[in-house]
Amino acid sequence: MRIKTALLLTVLVAVGCVNNRKAEQFSALPFPDVKAPSMIQDQQQIAEYLVEHWWDGLTDPQRNYPCDSTLVSGVSKGDVEQKFANWTVLLGAVDYKVAVKSVNRLFDRVVACEKKDTASNVFEEMSAIMEKYLYDPNSPMRNEDFYGPYVARLSQCEFVDEGMRQAHAFDARMCTL
């Protein structure tokens, strides 16, 4: 009986080690940085292009990436947050209408990711990062003018449960004060 138990434990440990090795082999993908077309030379136009297309690679609904709770569309959450911080700096450097258009475009793209695959965490993670950076009172990047359009759309989004929609509607109203 002891031999059978020892053999069973050995097999379980071996299988566990093989599975751990497979998990260790995966590494996060780099953030898909956007580059302005070379024909755009004006610095303001470059900033506008970048702010509008910043998230295209990450939020492409056709993008295939490994599903992992530590990643957003295959990119580490830390990298996504750093790129979000960089993007918010660019938002402040462009005209307000361009910034709002970019925020709305991001919302449309994360919703498209959610429609394609509800198991994807892109919608949830990007919405959480948006709130953390642009609405948290302790965030040095807090900007209700940029958060307002996003949260207003969250308040009407089919992928948000009714209770949270009401909370988002309240936040959207607070952003307009």
Spans of model-derived segments:
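Oxidative protein folding and maturation machinery
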Residues: 18-177
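C-terminal motif of bacterial Sec signal peptides marking the signal peptidase cleavage site
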Residues: 14-16
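Sec-dependent signal peptide recognition
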Residues: 2-8
